[in-house]
Regions:
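Pepsin/retropepsin-fold aspartyl endopeptidases
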Residues: 1-143
Length: 143
């Protein structure tokens, strides 16, 4: 994924996206989810600033497939590393992903055999700029 102005469709200079907080700093489980929509199927992705990719967990992928979401299989398996160890996944291209008031076209995703879907910096590279406001629990995504 990389910045291409024509891939981000919507009105306005930016869209503000609410972050859904999970846990607290006191229980060492502070995390944020972001709501996305892929061809009408809504889901939550864990915002992972340490992840390069945009991943779809197996549970979400099954929901997408059963809802008839089309995708392009790139016929490439990749290996990823993270806090949970290593995992293998298949690269696909999604026609469009809705986040906030924007629709993002041509999103490369890795389908993993794990339950969690991650929104990493790879997806955020589709925008010209991203501002993470931790106090307000928002992301500002700029065209």
């Amino acid at each position: 994924n990389s910045f291409k102005a024509k891939d981000v469709i919507g009105i306005g200079e930016f869209t503000e996206v609410s972050l859904l907080q999970r846990g607290t700093v006191f229980d060492a489980r502070l995390a944020y989810d972001v709501e996305l929509e892929i061809n009408g199927v809504k889901g939550e992705w864990l915002l992972d600033s340490g992840a390069m990719g945009f991943t779809i967990g197996n549970i979400m992928f099954e929901r997408l497939i059963s809802s008839g979401v089309s995708y392009k299989d790139l016929n490439k398996t990749v290996k990823s590393f993270g806090i949970g160890g290593e995992a293998y996944g298949d690269l696909v291209v999604l026609e469009e992903v809705k986040i906030g008031d924007y629709v993002v076209k041509n999103v490369v995703a890795t389908v993993l055999d794990t339950p969690t879907s991650l929104l990493g910096t790879g997806f955020l590279l589709k925008f010209s700029n991203v501002v993470w406001n931790m106090k307000e629990k928002t992301l500002l995504l700029y065209k």
